[in-house]
């Protein structure tokens, strides 16, 4: 668990981390450099779930290699499926990280939604549905590894 107190907002407790796969932690079906090391550190602190529509068919393989849980969403209303996952975990203790339009509801439902703008870009709708926006996944994960950075960003 990660606990932080943000001046002007209050105390937050993060127990779950939901990560979108393609475009967020993977590019062209490959995990981005630096991600495995950071997830290794975070696995000691939070429950990590990799959520994917499995566009490239490698979700299970990549999740296994990272030793995280996999949650596959079916074609259709992917936003609603991701939202349901966050609600099941408990939005009040879940951090979500994503870059696509189908991540919007999960970002809004989570206590902390982090928008990653990567080489794949980020949808306009997704960019306006965040608490924090960062240039890449490693910066996003570092915010959880070093939560004092979040305090500086989110304080009121």
Regions inferred by a protein language model and the residue ranges of each:
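Catalytic phosphate/metal-binding cores of nucleic-acid and nucleotide-processing enzymes, i.e., regions
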Residues: 12, 41, 69
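Substrate-recognition element of Asp-dependent hydrolases with the DxDx(T/V) motif
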Residues: 24-25, 38-63
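Non-catalytic pre-domain segments flanking phosphatase-related domains
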Residues: 1-19, 156
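Short, acidic loop-to-helix structural element flanking the phosphoryl-transfer center
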Residues: 6, 28-46, 79-80
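C-terminal cap/substrate-recognition subdomain and adjoining C-terminal extension
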Residues: 59-156
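Glycine-rich phosphate-binding "P-loop"
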Residues: 16-26, 68
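Catalytic beta/alpha-barrel core
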Residues: 28, 50-51, 70-75
């Amino acid at each position: 668990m990660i606990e932080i107190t943000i001046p002007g907002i209050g105390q937050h407790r993060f127990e779950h981390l939901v990560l979108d796969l393609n475009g967020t932690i993977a590019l062209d079906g490959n995990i981005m450099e630096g991600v495995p090391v950071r997830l290794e550190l975070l696995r000691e602190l939070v429950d990590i779930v990799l959520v994917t529509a499995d566009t490239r068919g490698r979700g299970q393989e990549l999740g296994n290699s990272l030793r995280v849980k996999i949650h596959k969403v079916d074609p259709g209303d992917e936003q609603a499926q991701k939202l349901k996952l966050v609600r099941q975990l408990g939005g009040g203790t879940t951090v979500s990280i994503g870059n696509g339009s189908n991540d919007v509801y999960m970002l809004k439902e989570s206590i902390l939604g982090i928008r990653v703008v990567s080489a794949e870009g980020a949808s306009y709708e997704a960019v306006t549905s965040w608490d924090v926006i960062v240039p890449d996944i490693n910066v996003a994960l570092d915010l959880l590894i070093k939560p004092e950075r979040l305090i500086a960003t989110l304080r009121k």
